[in-house]
Amino acid sequence: MTNISLKKINKSKVYQYIYRKKTTSKLQIVQELQMGLSTVSQNLNLLEQEGLIEKNGFFESTGGRKANALQIVSDFKISIGIGILKGMFHITAVDLYGNAFYTDTIPLPYSNTPDYYKQVTDAVKEFISSRQYDNDKVLGISIATQGITSPDHTTVLYGDIMNNAGMKLDDFSRYLPYPCYLEHDSKSAAFLELWNHPELDSAVVFLLNRNLGGAIITNHQIHQGCSMHSGTIEHICVNPDGPLCYCGNRGCLETYCSANSLEQASGMTIKEFFPLLREKKSPQLIQIWEDYLKHLAFAMKNLNLVIDAPVSYTHLRAHETLSDL
């Protein structure tokens, strides 16, 4: 191993240690990594000069000089997420810890036209320029949409909710000078679960948005299936004679356990539904909610028997949907 390689390894070890600890001191690094004080000091100076770390206050004194509190610069690099929905899109920017530090929702009905994709990507570029970020600061952009993608994540193959079959990654990436990735919104939610819970080996993920969605995690990976349909729990049939689903079948879990199903059954919006439900004055609303919970629990129990893994529920910017859960 060359001296240059060793220096790079030591520098990386120091940075990764600070990243994991979130806040630490020079002495803690020396002790934990068993490096010499001069080696640690040299690497801290390099990392600070490169803008990768910063001093942020002091630790309490134990009798001598107060030690600097060292942290990474969490937005040294950022990633951006775009959530495409039927009547709007969301933009979220996250730092190196995955913390969202910027979110915005922009009303814009989806249409498979160049003008639509230009408006979405212009909003992303406007955010980046407003923060005066250089292009190399952006690690990449992930686009989540309601639709099953091709195995290479370049095209939406099935998208009845938004009528977006044929949407292509290139529709966005041609306007954006960053690496881009296209994914089903439910599987994007599962990626978030893996990020927040790296110890998670397997799980069934329920995405409680306006439409129900789901994903399967096995062996720390999102299970895609042979035709990318794995995890589409919203189309499990719970009643062959039940309500008609947008997929053309009857009695799908979607028709019982989505915000849309609650609105259709109650004849009111979600914003109206939950406050009235909490008043406990309407037997009809209580029954609708109990039916929702009963079908959701039924699906969770059966999927747990198949996968034998924890069941998780989440939502992605679920405005006016089930964030009240």
Enumerate the predicted regions with their spans:
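Extreme N-terminal segment that seeds HTH/winged-HTH DNA-binding domains in transcriptional regulators
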Residues: 1-31
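Proline-aspartate-enriched helix->loop->beta-strand connector
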Residues: 303-313
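Conserved small/polar residues in nucleotide/adenosyl-binding loops
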Residues: 314-322
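Glycine-rich phosphate-binding loop and adjoining helix at the ATP-binding site
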Residues: 104-202, 323
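Short, cationic-aromatic polyanion-contact patches
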Residues: 2-9, 25, 58-76
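Gly/Thr-rich phosphate-binding beta-strand-loop-beta motif of the actin/hexokinase/Hsp70
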Residues: 66-101, 213-217
